[in-house]
Amino acid sequence: MRAYSSHKDIIKLVNKVDSVGLVPTMGSLHEGHLSLIRRALSENEKVIVSIYVNPLQFNSSDDLKKYPRDIKNDLQKLEALSDIIAYVPNDNEMYKKDKKKKKYNFGQFTKIMEGKMRPGHFNGVGTVVEKLLRMFNPTNAYFGEKDFQQLILIKALVREQKLKVNIVGCKTIREDDGLAMSSRNKLLNNTERESAGHIIRLLNKAREPVSYTHLRAHE
């Protein structure tokens, strides 16, 4: 594993390879991230993993400040995987002096679900993802289906900007109780964590088919 803070150093390593996989992350890596990276390793000659907590996608400075960070542990996890190229930029490297959200034509989709609760969030995500895609020109870029609204919008961004990259959606990796793995799970207290696990159990229960006999019994 090799870690770089400058994208120019990485470009020198990958500009002549047949296929490059990119896995954008905000760090605090867990098994969900590692599953994306393993898939990228199986499908590409070189794999770049970016670790950058993007300030443009946060709606408050407190939320940004609280986001879990553990770069030392992250790099150790990458070291254990394979020949990973880690990109660990600071704000100046990523945005220079132009630290502004780009506005995308995502339409009404940004005004529902997470977009409704976090105005401007997806423009912030799109800004950093587009920068990473243009920096490294990867063959494939990997994102979890856990953030399905984000995944759909990134695919829309790629079409809108006419970027030549294959966006790969990867299945959600879950905890033992069914909760989707997330870096933010670390911010939950015991009561909140238990409640989160209970919600997914209720959702799974609701998906179970109701038998015809059961319906007849309640007529």
Regions found by a protein language model. Give the residues of each.
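Positively charged, low-complexity intrinsically disordered leader regions
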Residues: 1-18
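Di-metal (Zn2+ and/or Mg2+/Mn2+) metal-binding site signature of metallo-dependent hydrolases
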Residues: 26-40, 150
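Residue-level signal for inorganic ion chemistry
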Residues: 30, 78, 143, 178
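ATP-dependent adenylation/pyrophosphate-handling site
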Residues: 41-62
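Divalent-metal (Mg2+/Mn2+/Ca2+)-assisted nucleotide/phosphate chemistry catalytic cores
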Residues: 65-140
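Internal alpha/beta domain cores that form substrate/cofactor-binding pockets in large enzymes
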Residues: 116-136, 141, 149-170, 176
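Conserved phosphate-binding loops in nucleotide/dinucleotide-binding enzymes
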Residues: 174-202
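Conserved small/polar residues in nucleotide/adenosyl-binding loops
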Residues: 213-219
